[in-house]
Each structure stands twice: as C-alpha cells, then as structure tokens.
C-alpha cells in the first residue's frame, strides 16, 4: 500500500513538471522551434533562400554556392564573382563570370568592354571614325578637338552654331569714326570665341582701285566714299586672321563678304595672306562636311559673298544660293522675325541677324545690349530654331561686347534639338 502511494506521487510530479510531455523539434538548437525558425539548420541561409537556391534547408552542412560571398547564391546572383561586371556582360565580353580575376578589357572605364564599346578610349570619337582618319581608337591622347570639344568634330558644318560679328572690322579700336559696330577688333573678338565675321570690301578711294588697295569699310551715306570715316587694311586684317588660325587648332572660320571689288582682287587678297589654301569649296546639293573633316583636311575656312556665283572662283559661295538670312537693322525687338529675308530658305546654312538700328540708321550699343542679353538672345535663337525647324548656323550681332552672344552659342551647341532641356548658363 505504501509503495502504491509513492508511485502515484512520483507520476503526479512528473506529469505536472512537463517531463513526460513530447519534446519540441529544434534542429539547430537556437531555442526557436523548427516550425517557427526561418533558418532551421542554422547555416546562415534562410529556408526560403535555400529552397530558391536548390539547397537543403534541413542540412546545416549543405549551403548554396556563393562565389563572391555576398549572400546571394550564384544561380540568383547577377554578378557571381563580385567583380562589378554582370555574368551576362562577362559572357558577352568573353571573360569568366565566376573568376573575379578575369575581367573584361575596358580602356576608358565606362563599364563597356572594349570589344563592344563604340568608343573604346573614351575620347568622344567613335572607333570607326578614328580608324578612317588615321587616329588610334585605343589611345585617348590621340584625338582631335573642334571648337573645344572632340564630339563637335562629328557635327556637320550646318549642324553647329557660330557667333558672328556684323561689320567685324568697324570698331573703335580700329579707329573707325562713324557707323561703329563694335568696341574691340579682331584679336579680342577671336579671344572671346567669335569664329564668323561679316566684312565689307571696297577700294580705298575712287582713284585707288588696284588689287593692293582693298580695304574693309562701309558707307554711311551716298555722298561720301565708304572709307571716308574709317578703314581697315584688308591685307593686314586677313594676315592677323591667318595667324590666329595658325595658332589655334580645331576651329572652322566663316567670312561673309559684302563685296564691291573685282573677284580677282579678293583672290589676290586670300593668296597674298596665305588664306587661299584653307578655303573649302562646297558643291551645291551635297551635304556639308563635318567640322572634323574640314579641320583634318586643312579646309577650315568657308567664304560667302553677296554676289552671284562666279565660275572662275567657285570658292566664293553666293550666300543667297548656298544659304539665307533673316531681316536685319530693325527699329525694335518686336519687329524681329525668324523668316527668310534674302536667299534660298531651303538651304540648311543660315544667318540669324540680331541687331537693331537707331533712329539715325546707325548701330546703337544700348539697343545691342538689349537684344544681346543672354536670355533674350537665347530665347530668340530657340524660337527661330523651332519655327524654321533648323538650328541657326550663325548668330550675328552688333556690339558683341554687350550681352553674351558667345555664351548663347555655347548653350545652343550643347543641344541637339530645340526641345532639349536647356543647359545651365556657361
């Protein structure tokens, strides 16, 4: 009887202590029962990760393959070896996607392997373009720059915008007295980025009409010789331009000549100053060449004149046949338009004339400051680009020092279309 009582007490104690209850499964011994444990086998990989990686979540000795140790198993890792090149990229480039020491050749570091990179050396010139022109597409130091940027060398002449000075020679610095268009002469204009120049060619006097007597000057009325109130020796001016071009690289220059001398005298002027060999001759109807090709071939000067085409001098391009201009010398901004005033509006090369005249018909620095102001000139250029569906090739101004014509052209040249986001002010 006494033994039965003791047995009963012992069983009761065991039952109330829970010692006879069934044990809860906990494979990894982390104190979390398996039914609630996100990593049953305690191998550092969650159950779902192991299932996705075709690994056994119930075996702590079996873990997913993870070559680069980024806790992303290789079957689901876009970059198995962790070398920053995706497996797909390495496969395309012919390197081992599970060997971090095997990486694609990438000369310019743009994460596009050289084999598939159109610009392997990262100099903004396509490999094929460089090869065709004798440059090394694998040497970032072997390149050409046009107007300060290699990428502009790919642009055609008519797909670039040049700052242009109207009556470029008519300056206070050059001691012109009446009808002054600018404060400073050619050197300052060049230094600030002007690369297109409108000039007027006359003989120095009615009695001096030899080829050596060509001057740049312009008339202020019908009663006086055009050079009475100031002139610039055309030979000296052109020699300076030639020197500036010789000491520069990658610049394409344009002259628009309002001409009043024989074509043979202009030919003498260009020959005597060493400029003749620079001149590019365009064939009407052909596409304009790229800036790069003009520079490479040493034909980086384009000359237009305001006369009919001359068969003996085909390099003197009739501006009205090879291009067109807007109106000019209006009295107010409200009168300015974008439409064709002179020339063939179907041609891609054109001049956006942007200067006003005073009530006396003369250039006016105050009016120039108004229309050359950055936002004003930029907005007009974009408006005309949109309206004519063609970027202005030239933006021509009086008193270039007033306002920011060169900064406007810098901004325009950063854009491929008028609807692009406008870049920040240079």
Pin down the residues of each PLM region.
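Secretory-pathway extracellular proteins and peptide precursors enriched for disulfide-bonded cysteines
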Residues: 11, 45-49, 63-65, 85-89, ...
């Amino acid at each position: 009887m006494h033994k039965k009582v003791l047995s009963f007490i012992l069983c009761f104690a065991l039952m109330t202590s829970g010692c006879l209850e069934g044990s809860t499964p906990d494979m990894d011994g982390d104190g979390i029962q398996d039914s609630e444990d996100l990593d049953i086998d305690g191998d550092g990989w969650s159950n779902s990760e192991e299932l996705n990686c075709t690994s056994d979540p119930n075996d702590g000795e079996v873990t997913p393959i993870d070559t680069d140790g980024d806790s992303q198993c290789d079957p689901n890792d876009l970059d198995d070896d962790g070398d920053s090149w995706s497996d797909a990229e390495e496969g395309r480039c012919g390197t081992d996607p599970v060997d971090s020491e095997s990486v694609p050749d990438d000369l310019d570091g743009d994460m596009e392997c050289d084999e598939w990179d159109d610009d392997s050396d990262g100099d903004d010139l396509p490999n094929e373009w460089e090869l065709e022109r004798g440059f090394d597409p694998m040497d970032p130091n072997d390149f050409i720059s046009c107007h300060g940027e290699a990428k502009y060398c790919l642009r055609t002449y008519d797909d670039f915008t040049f700052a242009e000075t109207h009556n470029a020679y008519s300056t206070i610095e050059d001691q012109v007295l009446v009808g002054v268009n600018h404060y400073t002469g050619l050197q300052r204009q060049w230094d600030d980025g002007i690369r297109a120049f409108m000039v007027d060619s006359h003989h120095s006097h009615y009695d001096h009409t030899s080829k050596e007597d060509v001057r740049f000057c312009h008339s202020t009325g019908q009663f006086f010789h055009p050079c009475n109130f100031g002139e610039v020796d055309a030979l000296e001016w052109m020699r300076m331009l030639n020197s500036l071009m010789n000491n520069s690289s990658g610049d394409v220059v344009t002259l628009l000549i309002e001409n009043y001398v024989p074509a043979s005298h202009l030919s003498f002027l260009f020959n005597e100053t060493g400029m003749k060999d620079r001149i590019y001759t365009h064939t009407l109807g052909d596409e304009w060449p790229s800036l790069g090709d003009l520079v490479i071939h040493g034909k980086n000067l384009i000359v237009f004149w305001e006369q009919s085409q001359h068969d003996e001098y085909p390099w003197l391009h009739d501006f009205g046949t090879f291009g067109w201009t807007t109106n000019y010398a209006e009295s107010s901004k409200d009168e300015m338009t974008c439409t064709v005033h002179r020339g063939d509006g179907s041609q891609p090369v054109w001049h956006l004339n942007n200067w006003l005249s005073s009530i006396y018909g003369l250039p006016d620095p105050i009016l120039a400051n108004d229309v050359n102001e950055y936002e004003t000139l930029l907005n007009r250029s974009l408006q005309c680009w949109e309206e004519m569906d063609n970027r202005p090739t030239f933006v021509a101004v009086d008193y270039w020092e007033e306002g920011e014509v060169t900064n406007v052209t810098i901004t325009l040249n950063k854009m491929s279309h008028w609807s692009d986001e406008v870049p920040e002010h240079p």
